[in-house]
């Protein structure tokens, strides 16, 4: 999180970049509504369950940027993650996040619920001037917990334990 630009700087950066292409000349692999959000024109909340990630440890809680736990199954991920405690304004680590993994799903949902707005953005391009959407209030966010390294060590220990058990079973079967 220390390497993220703050939200205002991110919005300004994207407005400057999009202004070079007059709002619609860039070929990004994201929806127009998400790009409009990056330029500060949409007021979205994070949808952390919208783009789940899986690695060798399992399904990452709540997203791949935080990795604050792992679930063995997708069902476990969805049922045991306290989704309401994550996102900008809810968790200190999420304060400056505008990443695709949480906001692209929100933008996709916005396009489905308001197709005329999505069409307008697609036709005119990303607006690069004028007022920005209001910021999310950060006053009630919970403090950050730094548990990623402990989670990785826990999972590595489980992998090593499982490998040792498998090797022991293989050796006893061969004997």
Identify what each model region corresponds to.
Residues 48-49, 94:
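Active-site lining segments that contact anionic ligands and/or coordinate catalytic metals
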């Amino acid at each position: 999180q220390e390497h993220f630009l703050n939200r205002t700087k991110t919005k300004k950066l994207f407005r400057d970049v999009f202004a070079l292409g007059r709002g619609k000349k860039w070929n990004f692999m994201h929806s127009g509504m998400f790009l409009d959000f990056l330029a500060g024109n949409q007021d979205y909340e994070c949808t952390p369950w919208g783009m789940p990630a899986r690695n060798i440890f399992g399904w990452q809680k709540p997203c791949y940027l935080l990795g604050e736990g792992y679930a063995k199954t997708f069902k476990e991920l969805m049922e045991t993650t306290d989704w309401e405690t994550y996102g900008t304004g809810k968790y200190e680590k999420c304060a400056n996040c505008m990443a695709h993994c949480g906001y692209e799903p929100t933008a996709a949902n916005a396009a489905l619920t308001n197709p005329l707005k999505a069409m307008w953005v697609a036709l005119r391009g990303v607006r690069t001037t004028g007022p920005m959407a209001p910021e999310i209030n950060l006053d009630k966010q919970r403090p950050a917990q730094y548990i990623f390294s402990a989670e990785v060590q826990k999972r590595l220990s489980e992998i090593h334990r499982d490998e040792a058990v498998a090797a022991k079973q293989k050796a006893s079967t061969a004997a």
